[in-house]
Amino acid sequence: MSNPERMFVSIVTVTYNPGELLEPTMRSVAEQVGVQIDYVVVDGASKDGTVERLRAFGEQVQGELVQGQPVHGGSLVFRWVSEPDRGLYDAMNKGLVMAQGDYVLFLNAGDTLAHPRVLADLWSERKGAAVYYGQAMVVESMGGRELGLRKPLPPQHLNWRSLRFGMVVSHQAFVIKRERALPYDLQYRICADIDWMIRCLRALDPGALGPEVVSSKALGVHFADRVLVHFLDGGLSSQRRKAAWKERFLIMSRHYGPLNNLLNHGWIVIRYVLRRFVPNFA
């Protein structure tokens, strides 16, 4: 049973042969204080020792200390499964089914929460929001050096229309009520996350089918103007990047209409060029 004085959140990590990347992610989850956590790891039958790491973590989470205080005191539940799946988004759907928290957050292997009170602070600022979102810091995959804030920066106000210019919020910095979290559409192999976020936000918006714009506050969407997560820089290959652009274009045409999407992508291309050549362009 959840405690109304604490956020009860399911953190879902999907893995396949993550190697040593999984351990800092699990550690950052275990270090969270002031929050009730249901931690779910969905592994795709890894062959690199991941199962052994999961077993070891399950044995050690009880009694770990952070700054001399019990990390969870019984408020962390850890569950995992390791079995074949049909890809990343199929595994994420499994995680949604397994999740028992009031909220859901997806955290990749190698990604870490910014500090031990990052989730508790969200709840202190605003209890019961439908969505919480914030900034993400990109870190180097080797060594963990901070490379800068993920861009584009998230908007001050977020609704489903905000994503017409691309993925303006990192999914690792997006916490949504579990009852509002729709399944991922498995027809998309690379960019199902932006389709998912658009559909989840659109379902919150009573004016989604009309011209009126509803404010983030009215939708129950809370913006935390700070870093919530550190995530690994892992660029796509050039071939996969082309496939991602094509798939994303189809997704956004579906949601915003072909002509509007074509015009929106004009700005996306301009923004991409400016970001490469103009220092500190957001």
Language-model segment annotations:
Residues 249, 253-282:
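Membrane-proximal basic amphipathic "stem/tether" segments
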Residues 226, 231-233, 238-260:
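Catalytic core of nucleotide-sugar-dependent glycosyltransferases
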Residues 63, 156-160, 212, 244-255, ...:
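Short, Lys/Arg-enriched charge-dense amphipathic segments
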Residues 58, 239-244, 276-282:
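Short, charged low-complexity intrinsically disordered segments located at boundaries
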Residues 1-238:
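Nucleotide-sugar donor-binding/catalytic module of glycosyltransferases
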